[in-house]
Design a protein with these regions (language model features):
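Hydrophobic faces of well-ordered beta-strands that scaffold small-molecule active sites
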Residues: 6-12, 29-33, 69, 122
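Core segments of cupin and vicinal oxygen chelate
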Residues: 70-109, 131-134, 138, 150-152, ...
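Glycine-rich phosphate-binding active-site loops on the catalytic face of alpha/beta enzymes
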Residues: 27-50
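Well-formed, non-transmembrane alpha-helical positions, independent of function
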Residues: 21-22, 56, 135
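Catalytic cores of alpha/beta
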Residues: 1-4, 14-29
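Vicinal oxygen chelate
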Residues: 51-52, 108-112, 137-174
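Alpha-helix-loop-beta-strand connector modules within alpha/beta enzyme cores
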Residues: 1-6, 51-61
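N-terminal beta-strand motif that seeds the catalytic metal site of vicinal oxygen chelate
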Residues: 58-83, 117-124
């Protein structure tokens, strides 16, 4: 079409249930809607409810979930031993990769040598990584830009600068 370089911000017909349908389209930059800021809430001055609804929309849009926990092992033998322990105790089959061994449905990643983080890392998945980065930056979170990986012009992985309790944290696109 004639407007292939434009990005849009729909506001009509958007609600909490279809928000992600809109945002999944790459031509949509943002969404708005009266479901977050209803006229009666404004008239009542119910700013707490407006704030709650808006935060709920942002939380749903970002959809943060734990994707996996990474554990730093000293070496490949220790990593394999740990993976076999998860398999024996919990039935989590292990899959050996080049730099790590995954257990279960990739919920646990055991590094074959110490990696990022004092103890390891935590991968947090999000529905929309570039929006998550922008949101967290506004909240004062710093990112290690040297860790950013991209595919087709979109970020697929990035580490936060600071560890949390000895764990590096990285965001990944779901």
């Amino acid at each position: 079409g004639p407007y292939k370089n434009l990005r849009w911000m729909p506001t009509g017909g958007v609600n909490a249930k279809n928000l992600m349908d809109y945002l999944s389209f790459d031509k949509i930059i943002a969404c708005g809607g009266t479901w977050m800021v209803k006229a009666d809430l404004i008239e009542e001055g119910n700013w707490d409810e407006i704030t709650r609804l808006t935060r709920e929309a942002v939380t749903n849009m970002l959809g943060f979930t734990v994707k996996h926990i990474g554990i730093n092992a000293a070496n490949e033998d220790e990593a394999l031993k740990a993976a076999k322990t998860f398999e024996a105790l919990f039935g989590m089959a292990c899959a050996v990769g080049n730099s790590s061994i995954f257990s279960g449905d990739k919920e646990i990643e055991i590094m074959k040598k110490p990696g990022r983080g004092t103890h390891g890392h935590i991968a947090i998945g999000t529905n929309t990584l570039d929006r998550a980065i922008a949101h967290l930056k506004l909240r004062g979170v710093a990112f290690d830009e040297t860790s950013r990986t991209e595919k087709n012009g979109r970020t697929t992985l990035i580490y936060l600068t600071d560890e949390i309790c000895g764990f590096a944290v990285h965001l990944v696109q779901k």
